[in-house]
Amino acid sequence: MGMLELVGEYWEQLKITVVPVVAAAEDDDNEQHEEKAAEGEEKEEENGDEDEDEDEDEDDDDDDDEDEEEEEEVTDQLEDLREHFKNTEEGKALVHHYEECAERVKIQQQQPGYADLEHKEDCVEEFFHLQHYLDTATAPRLFDKLK
């Protein structure tokens, strides 16, 4: 197992244990309800005009049941913010440096005698620079959304 894979696995485990699951913002929740209402109206139009009053009453009851059964897909606001900041100018530079380092390490690992090397390059420094930037950039916005 390479150093990058080990760091990646460690990071994923750390995120799972440390990062709390964040509920969707009220705006996202309202948008999802509006989309579901629009879908319900489309279904009613497809059913035809026969006994419209009876169909609407039945469809309303069915929609309520479906809403309860369907699990709403909640997006993690932290991940959304991280992706946003990875695409900023500073974020792109840090991601680029990390990916370059990862490529160098991957190439070194494939060369013979890698296991015997005294100093093996890892990308811990680049990784932590990237994570530090993402954490400091996302934290204020995330907490503002959670208020």
From Swiss-Prot:
Species this chain originates from: Saccharomyces cerevisiae (strain ATCC 204508 / S288c)
Protein name: Cytochrome b-c1 complex subunit 6, mitochondrial
Residue spans of biased composition, Acidic residues class: 41-78
One GO term describing the cellular component: nuclear periphery
The gene coding this protein: QCR6
Localization per Swiss-Prot or TrEMBL: Mitochondrion inner membrane
Note: Present with 4490 molecules/cell in log phase SD medium.
Main location: mitochondrion
Record-stated family: Belongs to the UQCRH/QCR6 family.
